[in-house]
Amino acid sequence: AARAAICSNDGSTGEGAGGADMTTKESGDAAETRALAHLQAQGLTLVQRNYRVARGPNARGGEVDLILRERDGTLVFVEVRQRRSAGHGGAAASIGLAKQQRIVYAASCYLRTLRATPPCRFDVVAIDGDRIEWLRAAFDAG
C-alpha cells in the first residue's frame, strides 16, 4: 500500500487552470505538440502524455511529458524542453540532475503499472527557436 501511495498518479492531464502561468503553459503545450508530431513522423506511437506522479510526505513527485513506443517495442520516456534561443546552453542543457531524477522516478512508477517491463530509454526533444533536436538516450536511470 505504501508503494501505491508513493507512486499514485495524480490523475492530471496537465491541463492548467489558467492565470498568470497560462502563457507559459500554452507555450509548453505547443512545444510538446511539436515534439510529438516530430516523433510520430519518425514512427513512434503515443502511449501517454503528461504522466504525473503526485507528491507525498515521502515522495518527490515527477512528470514525464511524453511516453511513446518504438516499432521494436521500446518504451521511450521523453522530456520536451524549449528555449527561444540557444543562450545559456540551449534547451537540452536546461535538464539538470534533479529534473532527470524526477523523470526517472515518474517513469519507474509508470513501469510498475505494466505486467511486463519492456526495454526503455530516456530521450529529450530540445526545441531551440525553430530548430527541433531529438536526443536519443539523453540520460539513463543510473
Model region roles, listed by residue range:
Residues 45-75, 142:
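Active-site metal-binding core of divalent-cation-utilizing nuclease and nuclease-like domains
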Residues 61, 75-77, 119, 132:
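Structural motif
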Residues 50, 65-67, 81, 125, ...:
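Anionic group-transfer/hydrolysis microenvironments
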Residues 2-53:
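Acidic-basic catalytic patches of nuclease active cores, encompassing PD-(D/E)XK
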Residues 130-142:
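Short, low-complexity, polybasic intrinsically disordered segments
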